[in-house]
Amino acid sequence: MTPSRPSWADPRRRGWPAELAALAREVLPAPMWAYLEAGAREGVTRDEAVDAWRAVRLWPRVLHGTGEPDTRGEVLGAPVRTPVGVAPTSMQRVVHPDGELAMAAGAAAAGALHVVSSNAGHRFSEIGKAARAVDPDAVWWLQAYLTPDREAAAPVLRAAAAAGARAVALTVDTPFPGTKYEPAEEDWQGHDLSWHRANFADPRAARHHRGLRGEDLAWITETCGLPTVVKGVVRADDARRCVEAGAAGVWVSTHGGRQLDRTVSTATALPAVVAAVGDEAEVYVDGGVRSGLDVLAALALGARAVLVGRPPVHALAVAGATGVRALLETLTEELAEALELAGCARPEQAQGLGAPPDL
């Protein structure tokens, strides 16, 4: 439990995520809020993401004697206290002076996976240190865009590995940023945007690769020694190709609805990806998750971990590391209640609740 938890972080209060978002909007610079909330083109994928989780229906179990649930689990063999994690976002030093350092500390305090954007405003070594200062066993991954110039990309991957990253989440849905009707460059006057290049000594490392292939996964692991998770998958056939290329995990994601608009929601895409992957790799999901019930729905459809993107940034803006911890713990408390009501003692037991049982 977070000491002196913020008033909005109360799982008994209906609509607390919207309250948190409203508080964040009050304190964030207007261009940062617009950037954070933007969806690609018409925002259809972004807007449908939230409703898609609410449309999932559950078949709870009874008479299983589960008692109080335990939300602990593992991601790629690393222990976490909750299946709820923090998805990568950039520009965090515009949100809060401590940026990713506060995000890392808050996630570590909650025992949650933290995925760090390659466009972080702090050095990976600083982020890893901030997490370990709270929990020596804190689990964090690097999210990476692979540049076509491997000579430039390799130092970034190795720096993250040296700083304690446990995996590389390779984003594959972004050959270039999709069009968003977000702030114009002049709207950012007075804000230092150079922060999001803290880990790029070579500017070539920030370029996006427009021709990624399966063999790039093996190169990443060979270069930095870390397992590779493929982020940005919504198709079952692509999920199979990821596994066959050596991916340790497949991350169902639409980039927060910020790439190809009208892409299917992650809640809709998840079951087929899980079925295609089987037990050959772990499956994760993000996109529109706003409550512990949403997390349960994702677990029921087969996700190992559930990542949230915008809400942690809202919490960071409002209350720094304390806010991030409070957000994650509140979602986990909601999940624990939902697990017990669904007849599940642990998160992995929720798989299958999203479909009627076979007799």
List PLM regions with ranges.
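An N-cap/entry alpha-helix motif that binds or orients negatively charged groups
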Residues: 2-80, 180, 187-212, 348-350, ...
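Short, basic, glycine/proline-bearing loop/turn elements
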Residues: 85-91, 139-145, 203
